Each structure stands twice: as structure tokens, then as C-alpha cells.
Amino acid sequence: MIDNEAPSLQAIRESLVTPDHEPNRMRISRAARSGALVRIARGIYLPASTLEGHPLWLQKTIVRGSRICALSMRRHDHILTGECAGWILGLPIITDKGPITAYAPISCGERRLSFDAVRIGSKLIMPAGQASIVRTSLPAHQIAEGFAIPFAPRILVDCARLAAKEQAFALTCAGIARLASYSRFDQLASRERAEQARHDLLRELASLPRSSRGTSQARWVISHADAGCESPGESRVLHALILAGIKGITTQEEVHCSGHTFFIDIAIPSLKIAIEFDGRIKYGDSVQEVHERIEAEQRRARLLQLAGWRIIRIRWSDLRRLDEVVAQVLVAIRQRVGR
């Protein structure tokens, strides 16, 4: 799940327990047998209380974060990459699932790092697993929040080639927007910076060995990603529309009508079709703010419709049925073309 409430990896690491001397080992062993501690990997434990009282997605997030931290703590010469490093950068990753990937020196003797299954009582939180270790010449890297990670372009390239395609697309959209300091209010300069960022990512991708996994996916994702997507939801909708072969799509389309300036999330300007993603959790902190926000949005919609725009609204729940969203857009296209 993508959620701002997910803890940082730094916070998760601070909660982990390691046996640093003999008396501590005995105490930890007793706590593990009693269920007060759960073992993440050999020599790395998490207090069970850290998981109690949370929804399953957050429990999975904490366990996955603990595994990432365990890899960093156990293998000091390894460099986290892909979605793990994206978490540290603040990209909109799905925190409760996904591979744990790291680069290791070619001379590294150990290839595998196994993780224990995690249970609270009889409830399985996460099955046993292992890290994906890539032995290679280590990329240039940095220390961020105490973790060794590559620089942003390499992280984004690895996300683009190793993550599931829809997630890879969303991460690359967010990454290019970040590299370009994208602003809807300065679109010309922002688009130029975004194209330079895209060029840099493609160059980084081309520098990888030919045998690297996922390079074809990464090339497609980087070539089609759009910095104008302001949320993972918008990115997922755009990804589905592109796969459906729909042409002439823009993001953050600037529209002037009745003395107002509006930005449409995803648009087909030639047909005046507006696809608006409602990703907000709430509209305000008071009843008055909620009413004012809803009234402003309704007036915005009326003005766009008076200017000839057909508006298709999409909510988070619709992302489970993207085929229906695409079908709705295709119907709107046929209706507009056939007028």
C-alpha cells in the first residue's frame, strides 16, 4: 500500500534488536522463545509490540522494512537499490510488498541472505523469503539516512526494470518529476528539464551490461513516463490509456475559461476530453471547508463543461477496474469523433 503513514526505514532500524554481547544474547534468546521478539534474520530481531494493533498492510510494511534494514546491517559492503532505495528517496513505492534488492561486490563470497517467516501468535504476517543479491562492479553510491544507495538516476533505472510494470511506470513518472523539479505553473521549462532527465535515465540504462534483467521494460517505461502525473493514481490511469493505444494524451493541460485557469490531470485536448483523478482522502478540516471545496470543484466542472469539455472522473476505487476506465474513455472518444 502507498501511504504517508508508513514509518521511515530509519525509524524501523532504530527499533531492531541485535545481540551485541553474551548476556544480551541470552536475554534476547529468552524473549524470542516467549514471543516478545520475532526474528527477522539471523541476529536481527523486532519487538513483537511494534506489530501489535496495526492493520495487516502496516504490519507487512514494518516487516519488509525490517528485512531491508537487516540486509544493510548484515552486509555492510552491499548497496540497496530498486524499490528499497526508492523508499529512502521518498518515492511513492508500495511499502508492504516487493523484492529486496542489493548490489554486492564481485568478490563477495555470500550470495544469499534469508529472512524468517514472521508470525504473531498463529497469524502469519509474512512468509519466509530472501534478498535478491546482484554481484557486480558496484555503482557510484551515497549514504542516505545511514543506508548505502546509488544516486537517483541509477535507482530510477533499477525501479523501471525490476518493479512490476505498472508500479515501474508510476515510480518513473514521480522520479522524472523530482529530477526535473516539475511545476505545472512553469510547464515549458519543466517539460524541457523532464526531457533532459529522461535522456539521462536512458543513458544510465544504456550503460548497464547487456545481460541486465528488465532492460526492455525499462526502456519502454522511461520513454513513456510523464512528469505531469502528480500522483501514483494518475500514473496508473495514464499507463492504462497508453497501453490501450489512445493517442494525443497530455497531462496538466492548461485551460482558460471564463477568466479562470484550470489544469486538467489527463486530457485529450483535440477532443476536449478531461480525465480527472480524485485522489484526495478528505476535502477539508471543517464542515465549512468541505462545502467550500466541493462547491469550488462543482463550479470548475460547470465552467469546463460550458467550454465544451467532457469530464470523466476517476477515484481510487476505480483503479481496481482500469479496464472499465479505459472503456469509458474509448466510448467518449467515439462519441466525440462521431459528432
Where are these regions (language model features)?
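Surface segments flanking catalytic/ligand-binding clefts of nucleic-acid enzymes
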Residues: M1-A11, T18-M26, S183, L188-R339
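Short gly/ser-rich loop at a beta-strand->alpha-helix junction or flexible surface loop bordering the NTP-binding
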Residues: M1-S212, R339
